[in-house]
Amino acid sequence: MIRKLILPALLLIAGSAQAGDEAGHAHASDADSHLATLGDIRLVHAWTRATDRGEALVFMEIEHNGHKAATLTGGASGIADGVNLVAFRSRDGNAGYVTLPDLTIAPGTEMVLQPEGVALRLTGLDEPLVEDQSFDMEVAFDLGHAQVIVQIEAPNATRHSHAGHAH
């Protein structure tokens, strides 16, 4: 019985190790769906809120450990018509998100995409986002693209349910 379980486990580990960076695209590993990498850039805890509306905001931590600036330009997802970089702004009593063309992240810094801050906005959602499910999303940088797994949290969530532990 144990022998029957070991072979599939080894095949899963080998497949995950081969999934590395191909043609400028990085993929989240099966063993750690909360982390994706693109060279010296780490994307941690991608999440959004459950919604039945046509758009949603995606949040995450972006750690840039490289020596050259990286520019976040947007993204793509099979569940949405578009993915735009946005920032929260409150002016003259009006609050909301405005589109940003891109965002440069300095080497050795961390950028936190969070509610009422900077986020990636999914527009034209094909279907509702259901709590405790997840979906794939590509995050685009000038240096390449990283594939993240976005966890869908409660409609009123203010952070990822696993935020605060190390990866």
Residue map of PLM features:
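Compact, glycine-rich, soluble single-domain proteins
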Residues: 20-167
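N-terminal signal peptide c-region/cleavage motif recognized by signal peptidases
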Residues: 14-16
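Domain-length cofactor-binding catalytic modules of enzymes
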Residues: 10-12
